[in-house]
Each structure stands twice: as C-alpha cells, then as structure tokens.
Amino acid sequence: MLGSLLTTLGTGAVVGGGPAQAEDTSSDALVLTDDSARYPDFVRGNNQRWVGRPETVVLPQSTPQVVKAVQQAVSNGKRISVRSGGHCYEDFVYNAETQVVIDLSGMESVGFDEKRDAFYVEPGATVLNVVETLYRKWGVTIPAGMCYSVGMGGHISGGGWGLLCREFGLTVDHLCAVEVVTVGADQVARAIVSTNAPRDPTRDLWWAHTGGGGGSFGVVTKYWFRAPGSHGTPDTLLPKPPAEVYLHVLALPWAQMSQPDFTALVRNYGRWHEANSAHGGKYDSLMSFLALGHQSNGQLSLMTQMDATLPGALDLLQRFVAEVTGEVSAVARPMDRPMGEFAPMQDHFTAQRIPWLQATRLLGVTNPTLTNPAMRGDFKSAYLRKGFPDTHIEALFRHLTRTDFVNPNAMVVASSYGGKVNTIESADTATPHRDSIIKLLYQAYWSDPGQDTANIKWLRDMYQDVYAATGGVPVSNEVTDGCYINYADIDLNSPEFNRSSSPWWELYFGANYPRLQQAKARWDPLNIFRHGQSVRLPGS
C-alpha cells in the first residue's frame, strides 16, 4: 500500500508569473492512493486497454490547487499526467511511467466572465455540460464535439471539432484566452493567463492550445471563448445554433451491397463534398456521417443533420441523400441496430424536425461505447482534401468484407468537414488542416481482452492498405492531409507502420510544428509534460 486512504497536498508551492492570482483559502486538493475505495475508478479512462497504477491521483478544484499539485510532483521528481474527461485513445494518461495523475474532473464550471467579456469553461466540464449551459442560459454555443462525456481540457487543445464546424468553424476559432499551469527552468510551477491579443507577450502559449494537443505545455485550468470581432451583451458573443434541425438516418444492408454499389456510395459522398464544402453556400449547416461498418454488422449508414429553419432545408437534405445514394441498388431501410458510436435510430428514417438541443443530446448521450464499462478500442484518422481515390475505395471494401474477421463494431466513419473551418489560415491556429473536406475515423470497439490482437491487426491492415501508395499513412498531398491529433495513434511513430517520409508530428501539425516546439521550449523547458506524442523540445 502506498499510504493512508486519503492524503492532502502540503502548502508552500511557489505561485507566480502571469496575472496576479487570488489567495487560495480553500482546503488542499484531495489525493487518492491505491488503498482508497475510489482509486480503481480514477486510474482508467473510457478505453479499458489503458489502466494505470499511479502512486497518487490528485483531484484539484481550483487553479491554486493545481499549482500546488504540479509543484509537489516536480519537487519530488514524480512523472505527471493530466486527465480531464478520460477519452484519450492511447495510453498518454494511464501508463506504467505515470506516478501522479492530476484529474481535473472536479473543475467543471461554465459561466460568463464580465472582466474578460468572455465565456469561461473549466477543463473538467464535459461537452454536453458546456453545450447545455451556454444554450440554456444565453442561447449561444461553441461548435464543440458530439460525445457527451468528453472533457473540454483535451478536446479544445486538440482543435475542438464538432457537428457545427462547417457553419461556425472549430471551437478553437473562438478561443480568446487560456489559463495554464506551467513549469519554468527554475522548476517553479506558475499559473499563466495567455490571450490572443496581438501584443500579449505570452500569446504563443494561447496559440499552442489552439490545436497543439493536450499534455505538452502544462495543465490547462480554464478556457475563455468569444467569437472574433464580437461585441455587446453575452448573448451576442458566441454563435447561435439553429433553433431546430432535421435529423435523418438511413441504413443500407450489406446483403444487397455489391462492390460497384459500395464504390458508388463512397465515391458519391466524396464528390458531393468536393462540390459543397466552400463556406457561404446553402449547405453550410449540413453535417453528415457515412458509417462504413464491417459486413458482420449487416449494414452501412448515412446520418445527416441540417438547420431546419433555412428556406427549403428539407429539400436540400433530400437532394444530398439522393446524390450520395442514388446509384446504389441496395434498398435503404431504418437503422435498427447499433453501429459503434451510433445507437439505433429507426425513428429518423423519415427526416424529423426537432429542437437543436434535443438532437444534440440524442446523438451524444445514446452513444453505446461510452456506457459499456468493458469497452476497449483502437483508432486511426485521416483528412481528405479531395474525394476518395478508387484505390482507397477498393482497399476499404476488401477489409470491410473480410470473412476472417468478425466485429459488428468495427468501421470507418467519414464525417463532413470544410466550410467555415477552411476560411482560417493554417498558421492562425495550431490546427493546420484548413483545406480538407472530409475527416475519417477508423475504429474498432470490443470488450474481450483476448480479441485485442485481432482487432488491432485488422485496423492496421486496412489502414496500411488504404494508404499503401504513401507509406501506409495519409501524408499531406493533393488528396490527403495527415491526421487528427485528438484521434491519437501511436503507430504513426513507428517505422514499421509509417514508412513515409512524414514523421508523426508532421501528420498532425504540418508546418506549425517548429512553432509549437518554440512554445514548448519557452513554457516547458524541462519537458515535465510529456507523453508518446507530446510536442518535443527543439533538437530532440
């Protein structure tokens, strides 16, 4: 045993730098050790492949408590990792080297900061909590992700993709400030508030958190959001989501799906996005998912959401569906069984007009993979600048129809991208992917640890086959543009699986990586905050 049931961090940590901090008069953060009854719940995230055994789990509820936790760990030479929502796809939080986990789930406030004239969000707040609070209190939103329990700490620092991105951009496009606990060369932990103000001397720290990923620069303790150029009352400072949306979901049975049908479906989806991803068009508010499930699931599906208040919205949605599925001989039917992250939604085979918040809850809360306590998974990603080449489609079909592998929760999900996202220059934020039209998520979910090898191999085989012409990964070229940092994939580090001339950091960050390294050198010169794909110090 590592000690008492509960311990508390001692005082005496040095707090300095950045704006003055209010004196912390609260009690010290709770610390769990391995003899705590709650310990098992705090050493694992959503992916049960990764279970840690840290000496301590610290549960701060304020920035000063985070400063103290970081300072004590640094002073004692302990390896730190940080958790906000527990959705990291790799072992970057829970691994054998981690000795202290700083769990931010207790820092979950969402509100309006009158001094900064901006909305604030703490890192432990979840996507659904943030979306509901902003909308119910002020009628606004940020274009954050879909899965309800994802923590904002990592979601935002990785870019913050969401269902409204084609209309409003990425969440980081509305980020105006961030508070981060950093550790300088003097080994002192400090809370720094960095803003997007052009003359802010710490602006590089803000920029690093607009897509540089979590766990590289420090511990985020607060984000502030305000739409660029906005002024006025709080209800005018962030985008307003549509009052109502159309939600339409169909399934196509694999039993009726020939290879030409599959080719037409995937090709049409890509071609539609090539023609309809410029911002300012009539389809800005359309978001779709094309879920290409393994044939053992029995179906593929197309899910579409669109602003129902627009003139002719239902007709536009129906035209989209017709253009994607029109050349497919398989007869569309209701989606009456789950597909990975998507619950059955047979009631939406006919497009339903429903309130936006209700639709957001439906798509997020019903995710079966987030409620299975035994769920394990593996994931890969890609951005597409153009539609799917025939060689990619052929490789997808080969692996989705393999009979030597069976998993109804294995699939590739193509999601709409572009629109407002692509109006931002690649260097304006740390998120470089600003001319793509589709984002791909390769995924497999399973529960039996004995199936780890089979699932990981199947996903690797498919990914390697799809991108065989470019070294097994989606390098930045005229068709593909690298990978999404929030869909972490440690295989990109390995020369066995990445045979291209593009290292993992180039796939994630493109030309922005040297600038991220400079921010790393300034704000984490001792490399305190690190993991398998954290930003490296210059020269390393």
Task: Please place each PLM-identified region on the residue numbering.
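C-terminal segment of N-terminal export signals and the immediately downstream linker at the start
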Residues: 13-36
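Loop/turn elements at helix/coil->beta-strand transitions in domains of secreted/extracellular proteins
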Residues: 27-29, 53, 75-80, 97-99, ...
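Cofactor-binding catalytic cores of oxidoreductases
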Residues: 29-46, 85, 90-93, 235-540
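Glycine-rich N-terminal segment of FAD-binding domains in flavoprotein oxidoreductases
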Residues: 36, 48-107
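Glycine-/small-residue-rich beta-strand-loop submotif within the FAD-binding core of flavoenzymes
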Residues: 94-122, 163, 167-168, 225-227, ...
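Short, structural beta-strand-to-alpha-helix junction motif
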Residues: 117-118, 125-135, 149-152, 338, ...
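FAD-binding subdomain of flavoenzyme oxidoreductases
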Residues: 144, 149-255
